[in-house]
Amino acid sequence: MAHSVPESMDPNGPIRVEHDRKRRQFSVRLNGCHDRAVLLYEYVGKKTVDLQHTEVPDAFRGRGIAKHLAKAAMDFVVEEDLKAHLTCWYIQKFVKENPLPQYLEHLQP
């Protein structure tokens, strides 16, 4: 599920999210390969993930990058038929603002 990533991030260009299953993270390369925005998760059960933390460097905030990370993580949860525990406040906010049925039915009660 890894996507190609542009060498540098054009503020008006597409944001591409990479999924590193081994490191259990979604990331967006910023400014070449030095800066990254990341969303970290852990498996807390066989079919349950804890979406723990989203971080975007200060210089890149306000551009919708965290929203792309949250969407990629929730789409992963749906595609893999997992349950999600939302520890990260930003992902809680994302799901509240985007209450899609496929997201809501995959939330851990």
Curated annotation (Swiss-Prot):
SUPFAM superfamilies: Acyl-CoA N-acyltransferases (Nat) (SSF55729). It comes from the Eukaryota. Residues 1-20 are annotated as: Disordered. It holds the Pfam family Acetyltransf_CG. Transmembrane segments: none annotated. InterPro entries: Acyl_CoA_acyltransferase, Gcn5-rel_NAT, GNAT_YJDJ. Residues 18-108 form the N-acetyltransferase domain. Belongs to the NATD1 family. PANTHER family: PROTEIN NATD1. This is Protein NATD1. The gene is natd1.
